[in-house]
Amino acid sequence: AKELGCTNTHFANPHGLQDENHYTTAHDMALIAQAAYQNETFRIIIGTKMYTIPPTNKHAEETVLRNHHDMLCTYHNANRKYLYPYCVGGKTGYTATANSTLVTYAEKDGMTLICVVMNTQSPNQFIDTVNLFDYAFDNFQVLNVAENDTDYRAETTVDNGNLNNIAPFVELDKEAVIVLPKTAEFSDTSSSVEYNDSDPEIAGSITYTYAGRNVGKADIKTTGVVVEGYAFDNESTEEEEQEAVSTVQVKPKRKW
């Protein structure tokens, strides 16, 4: 949890039952949920509505497991009142001290959101989550960085005095996105570049902010293109002799 950036979380047990040394916050739980969602098996499990375990040597009959998340299925929601069409999974929780808690994932228009609701009375955890999701989907948008950022130009320059060859040596991550209010444009963001010398496949990264808040990041990836320079003059003076030099340049047009 600490590696994910959690600052107010301490686990005293693996099951979540009440313990005075077992605590977290909505923000920390969202960070944990975000990391967990990167695991494909986890995504399958939380989105499964029902699963049947076949008979085993310990249990002669089938065991049917049902998801209790009312925004995803109808096990405790026969009238379908809380079903949410964009819900893709989540986890319910309850103790007498913590009351009802809920972590939910929803996807719409290319945007995946996580909502964490704590310390509420059922069924308010579902009502509040639906309202929060609706507000976010109605008011925010996902923008692809590579398709929208024209302020950075990545190129290689090979210069030996006779040849200036420009080729695509690095490029912005084509999958990187940022999240902005629908009233804002990509050009409204500010950005900063951090260079990387520890990963041969990542030249650096660009962090985007809007209204002082971090709204996303895009890696600057190497493409694997190799550019070689050749000197055309067999005889040259000492001042003219230059080795072919390859450089990676990320040229921002914007001012930070």
Per-segment meaning from a language model:
Residues 6-7, 21-23, 27-28, 33-256:
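Domain-terminus/edge residues, biased toward the C-terminal soluble/receptor-binding domains
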Residues 1-10:
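Short, charged, amphipathic alpha-helices and their helix-cap/turn boundaries
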Residues 14-20:
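Conserved short loop/turn motifs at secondary-structure junctions
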